[in-house]
Regions:
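Cysteine-centered metal-binding/redox modules
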Residues: 4-142
Length: 142
């Protein structure tokens, strides 16, 4: 019951459901893997991922390696989104350092595919111009 209440509170605060619902987040992430070439699974051991990405985008492998979630215009690392993610990770656990996890994984929220994603990964939905910061959100509100 508490999880349901947390989800309602998250939505009321303007947070995407996937920032607070791990099952929804993992479902959306799996869809990104299956349908949008989200990866590599382990950025430290990419094993052919970048070669495949280069073929998808018709660019060199070196160029494909620059097309990361961390510089995608759908990658939201604004203060407000980081708070949404931190609140969702922490939940009711007072001993959890959610920001440490966010920082170590370089997490942001993908506004296109609706899940928490790592800045060191990439996918077919990548577009230039990111990431989204609080400053960008303030500009769009004007």
């Amino acid at each position: 019951m508490r999880n349901y209440i947390n989800l309602i509170e998250a939505v009321q605060k303007g947070c995407p459901v996937a920032t607070h619902d791990i099952d929804k987040n993992l479902k959306n992430r799996q869809a990104a893997i299956d349908n949008y070439h989200y990866g590599p699974a382990n950025p430290d051991r990419a094993e052919g991922y970048w070669k495949d990405s280069a073929l998808i985008f018709d660019v060199s492998e070196a160029t494909a390696k620059t097309m990361l979630c961390g510089n995608c215009a759908a990658f939201d690392v604004s203060d407000s989104m980081r708070k949404c993610m931190a609140d969702g990770i922490q939940g009711d656990e007072t001993g959890v350092d959610a920001n440490a996890s966010i920082n170590l994984a370089d997490l942001g929220y993908c506004n296109f595919l609706h899940f928490k994603c790592a800045g060191s990964r990439s996918c077919k939905a990548w577009v230039t111009g990111g990431p989204i910061t609080e400053k960008d959100k303030n500009k769009s509100a004007d």
